[in-house]
Every structure is written in C-alpha cells, then in structure tokens.
Amino acid sequence: MDKSNGLRVILFPLPLQGCINPMIQLAKILHSRGFSITVIHTRFNAPKASNHPLFTFLQIPDGLSETETRTHDITLLLTLLNRSCESPFRECLTKLLQSADSETGEEKQRISCLIDDSGWIFTQPVAQSFNLPRLVLNTYKVSFFRDHFVLPQLRREMYLPLQDSEQGDDPVEEFPPLRKKDLLQILDQESEQLDSYSNMILETTKASSGLIFVSTCEELDQDSLSQAREDYQVPIFTIGPSHSYFPGSSSSLFTVDETCIPWLDKQEDKSVIYVSFGSISTIGEAEFMEIAWALRNSDQPFLWVVRGGSVVHGAEWIEQLHEKGKIVNWAPQQEVLKHQAIGGFLTHNGWNSTVESVFEGVPMICMPFVWDQLLNARFVSDVWMVGLHLEGRIERNVIEGMIRRLFSETEGKAIRERMEILKENVGRSVKPKGSAYRSLQHLIDYITYF
C-alpha cells in the first residue's frame, strides 16, 4: 500500500448487493493508493464493517419499516430511501467536515470528495452546499446508462403495443442493439414514476464533478464512451473490471457456501454449468421446475445458486436434484467463475455478473429478466457472440438444448474461441498501460488535486 497522502474520500453506496460490492472494491483500490476511506451507509443492508478494518464506517437511519425492507419493487425502495436519507446524510456529512476542519498537525486530513451511486438523487445539491466535489459511481454498462434516458421519449412515441408481432425482431435505432420486443419488456416494467426518477439521475449526474464506471472498460464500451463524453461534459473514468484489482475479495450481504469449491474440485475441467440469477431476481414455481428439469435432463453437472426466498415453492424438488449437481444458497461467484471446472454460466445478465464471466472467459446462456439485463444479453449473444440467448417462455427442452449446444464441439467450440479473444482484450485493459489501468491513474490524479 502507498503511504497515506493526507486525503480522505467519503463513499456512500446504495444498499443493494450489486452496488455495495463495486463501491467496496473501489474503496480498496483508493486505499491502496494512499487515501483514507470513510463509508457512510444505511441501516438496511449495512456492509460488514468487521471485514474491512482499515475503513471507517458510519451508519445513518434510513426510515424503512420491516415490511418495506422486504419489497421486491426496487423503484419504490429507492424512492423511500431518497426521501428518508437526505436529512441524516446531511447531518453526518456536516460532522465529518467539521471534524476534518478541527484536526491539526500530522492528524489533519483533507476530505477530497464524495463518491456515491447515481441512484442517490439528493446528494448532488447537498455536496454543492458544502462545496464538496461529488463523483458518481455507476455499475451499468456505459451504453445502457447513456441510452436509457431516452425511454420516456420512446414511451411517448407509442412503442407499446406493437402493431405487428413480426416487428418484435426489428432493431431499436435509438437504443442499439435492443430489439423492439426487448424494449417492450423494459417499458412494460417501467412506470412514469421511474421516468421521473431517471430524469433526476440525468440532471444530477450532469451537475457532478465526474462519472466513474467500475465495471467496464474501453474494450467493452468504446463507441458509447465517446458519445457519453459529448453528452455529459464531465470527466468519465472507466476503471473496470474493478474486481480484478483484488481477486477473490467480496462484500457479500449473503452468507457464502464455501462447500461448492471442494465439490468443483472433483469435477472434470470445463464440465460444469453454473446457474445464478443474482441477488434480486425471483422465479416462480413453474419456471423453477422448467429450469430444474432442463438441468436434470442435460446430463451436465451443475452448480445452482437458489437464494432463500428467491423461489416460490419448489423447495421439495431441490433435494432430488443433488444427485445431478450441487445447490447452494449463495456462492463466491468470482472464485466459482475462475474455477477450471466451470464451462458455462446460465445467468440473468446483470452487468457485474456479465463482466465477471467475460473476465474469466466463461461462455453464457442469457436469461434476462428486467431492465439493463436485456441489453447486456443482446451484447453477449448478438454483438460479441460469446453466448446463447434464451428468448420467450422458459421451457425445459429449450434450456436443455442450449446447454447441450454450449458444451458441444461445434457451436460451443466457436463460442468458446470468441470468448477467449474477448477475455484477453478485457484482461489487458487492467494491466499496466491498459485502458482501465490508465483511466484509474487519471482518476487518482483528478481527486488528489481537487
């Protein structure tokens, strides 16, 4: 670790698994470059401070009831958090800045900046009131973050419903490489409340001092990056895949089942299909049964993450599946994906999961559910051609067929070869002189001299 540079960075993650992990990864990177780290966090989904003894953690009340913490409506959850957290956040930030001003001698540290998630829409005016630079951390693909702001316009232009079912495969010119049927799925899940929320994210991001993409690099987002720099007119840093700087490091909100690693050790190389749909997605009993039968019938060993509460019923079937594979409540995903036994990944295509799979060179079967997952799946299957896309209804024979195709010596081999090339390109980005490595150094220099 570099010697302390006398600067402190304040981080404020959204309390979601897909946001906390990247923020803590960024904290570790900055700390290794000499910055002191303070993490402000909510009571809900609080990170485990004991896992990170070198950081200072400050908890603020979030106003959520027990019922509200169990909601699957992410838009509602974010609305409630933004409504309840502004006052306690301002109070916490005031105390931090006053404390920094009162320090003297060798103990004195200057607070360089605030780094928080784009989903916090009150933090920009709060930071401005203290003349504190705010940088926005983003965990989406650049193209999604840039283009999803056109969704309210597309809603107004009446993409819903399609006049002709055959139009479903037509491209969406304003949002490539989405197809119209993908867009309908996104718009169908959206609401006018989310449109308003997205507009506020856009406004506060443009008013910020910079934009950090921790899970992407120029090799994955080059065209969108040049357009985003024109749109936002703020410095943009693409430093990902950020997990590569501290391999195996995790800030999971779930208890990890480490027994899956010894199980993988006993499997043949490239033989196991890993199945995980992230920390938020839930599936119904019918969908669960179709996936279960597909895995059972594929004759391929599998490791399946089935979170507690993520499946409606179907629990009695889980025991019967253990003879064909292994089922766990949560897995150390980065460690799993880099294991030599893993040959494929059946995924929801959250961006973090997609990038982790690319970084380890694991081909994917794409089963997107919501939001940016649909765009990410299109890039995997249609642009990079490093996976297969499950479209339409979830049916056992279709999933089984895709597993067989992915592990075949014909189509599967071609997919694996393309994935290996993409893996090498992304891997070079985080090495010295690589695009992400250079961008990280630019970020360090930028926040050092505020």
Curated annotation (Swiss-Prot):
Keywords: Glycosyltransferase, Transferase. Its EC number is 2.4.1.-. This is UDP-glycosyltransferase 76C3. It comes from Arabidopsis thaliana (Mouse-ear cress). Pfam families: UDPGT. The keyword Secreted does not apply. It is an enzyme of class 2 (transferase). The gene is UGT76C3. One of its GO terms (molecular function) is UDP-glycosyltransferase activity. UDP-alpha-D-glucose binds at residues 279, 331-333, 348-356, 370-373. Belongs to the UDP-glycosyltransferase family. It comes from the Eukaryota. Signal peptide: none annotated. The keyword Nucleus does not apply. InterPro entries: UDP_glucos_trans.
